[in-house]
Amino acid sequence: MAAGMVTVAAPAEAASTPSGACGSGYYLIDQHALGSVADIYLFYNGSSNCAVTWVRSPNGTRTYDLRVQIERKSDLVVAPDGGFYKYYAGPVKIGAANTCISWGGSAEGIRWASGWTHCG
């Protein structure tokens, strides 16, 4: 993926772990709780960040209002995803070498955003 690329992936099959949603080569660099409903996970693979808002205890039938996004500071490009999902929002990916990102999201109205961080 080129450094300027932004993607929102919709896997054919639901991933079984947050890291699995991003794909191979990504490792966890940060996470934040959204109350008791979900967590936002941030992954990195050496050139791109990936974020997922992951429901903690899905029952397989209920849908949750979930949002996730990453913003790149160098040009303010945003990679967002949101809607009503059973398991997770995202993954959203953005190339972010040599710049900072802001990442965050929401679950059932509980919102959080990081501010500029993970600069590199």
Identify the function of each model-found stretch.
Residues 14-120:
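Post-signal peptide N-terminal regions of Sec-secreted extracellular proteins
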